[in-house]
Amino acid sequence: MECQRCPASARNPATVESRKEKFCDECFIKFVSTKQRKQMMKDEYFRNLFKVIYPFEKEGSVSKILLPLSLSDSGSLVMLDIVHDLLLEQTKQHNNRTGFTVDVLTVFTEENVSVIKERMESLINEKMSQLNKISNIFNVHFIDVNEFFNNASEVSTFIIDNENFEIFSKSKSVDDSNILTLKEILGKYCLNNSSRSDLISIIKTQLIKHFAYENGYNAIMWGHSMTKLSEVIISLVVKGKGSQIATFLDSESFDTLNNKPCKYKNLYPMKDLLSVEIESFLQIRNLAQFLINVEETNVKPNCLIARKSLPSLGQQKLVKNMTINEITNKYFQDIQNDYSNIISTVLRTADKLTQPKSSMAKPSQCQICQSKIYTNPSNWLNRITVTSPYPVETTEEKYLFKQWQDSKLGQSHTHYVELLNEIKQGASNSLDVEDGDVKLCYGCLILLNTSIKDKNLVWPKVDTMDITANATNNNKELSQILDQFEINSDGEE
């Protein structure tokens, strides 16, 4: 088989087959890179961000771009590789000048800090140090996921009244004796893997957006492929967060955070690429070595002709043990080689959605995920749900009720009622208007009601957070890597 894009006089052997077309390695790399660069130049705002603007002394001629890099995600790594090549081209064409600088942000946990250190050392040495010898084009930042809790001066305990779905909260100040950690939140409050996955995703997204807001970036480049975006869209619908889809995909408007306007826009440069194409690019460019899950990456579906590989049956989870995100991921991974039109249809349909009309008296944002709230979910659930129990009457019913009260489930319910009454009392005595008017989006309300222990969750107050306080230098060993390769940032000192 020969490449269909090479000149007829010198066709190379085909190594990739995607979208019913055959490519050699070189043509496929060009195909993927062109798809990403086209998105980076999608409108005037982004064109002005990424192109080299003359004169160089003009204020704002060099844009600041934030690139969240996950070393367990192929998309963000491939995106970084293509951006690196674009910057290299600009330095050659414009006398060592570039139109933008890139700040790479990695959010890490205690469990993976050592392997991230190892992989980032290799990545910095191979992909960033060359350009930084010319100019300070790449900056690298690290944030411990626990900074989401450490940098908030106040936390709120949210609880749902299961009689009418009304939400109450109680705020308290944070000091060294009561700082929360991710491990504590996931272990103490989450009842299943789906709730853990949702909270981790919310925390990481909020950390990245706060970092962008506080440091004045012009854009955040997310490494979501077309497949990944479709997965997120379906997951949002399943979780009761379908109203967030239009905002999630919006790359035309400036973002908002805690009802405050931001100076950056969100961009998805990989949205025209399937995840199998990204995995193939990863293998061709030998980028898998930088990921922390190399073995898992090597068995992901791709569109390489000679190196296609699929997970063995022994590696697959049972559906009942999978999170909502994992189920949607499996579905789209299974169909994307043969039915990629389904994936593109999901994304095209979602792109046409607009934000719902709000029925709220004033603009509100969810206290947990920070999404916009368009209608009060508590009122709607209360109208359609019967929550009052049937009274206990017979001797047998009283006996069974007593058994239930003495069980772990009954004791948990007793603890929930006590906590609810305590928080209700605190809310009624509070002079803080915000505490008396707590709002959660429908998805987070359902999460709290069904997947969180005792229907209560302790969560930082977003407007009291300062993410940059400990960014980059919260791990000395990681900072030493940056020093070694002269990849520095202003927030590092």
Curated annotation (Swiss-Prot):
**Compartments, as annotated in UniProt:** Cytoplasm
**Post-translational modification Phosphoserine, affected residues:** S489
InterPro entries attached here? CTU2, Rossmann-like_a/b/a_fold
Of the GO CC terms on this record, one is: cytosol
Q: Which GO molecular function annotations are given, in alphabetical order?
A: nucleotidyltransferase activity; sulfurtransferase activity; tRNA binding
Keyword list (alphabetical) reads: Cytoplasm, Phosphoprotein, tRNA processing
Pathway assigned to this chain's UniProt record? tRNA modification; 5-methoxycarbonylmethyl-2-thiouridine-tRNA biosynthesis
Major subcellular site: cytoplasm
One GO term (biological process): tRNA thio-modification
Entry keyword tRNA processing: yes
Q: Which Pfam families match?
A: CTU2
* Superkingdom: Eukaryota
Protein function: Plays a central role in 2-thiolation of mcm(5)S(2)U at tRNA wobble positions of tRNA(Lys), tRNA(Glu) and tRNA(Gln). May act by forming a heterodimer with NCS6 that ligates sulfur from thiocarboxylated URM1 onto the uridine of tRNAs at wobble position. Prior mcm(5) tRNA modification by the elongator complex is required for 2-thiolation. May also be involved in protein urmylation.
- Entry-linked HAMAP family: CTU2
Q: Subunit composition? A: Interacts with NCS6 and URM1. May act by forming a heterodimer with NCS6.
Instruction: Please give the family membership noted in the entry.
Output: Belongs to the CTU2/NCS2 family.
Its protein name is: Cytoplasmic tRNA 2-thiolation protein 2
**Taxonomic classification, please?**
Eukaryota, Fungi, Dikarya, Ascomycota, Saccharomycotina
> Its gene?
NCS2
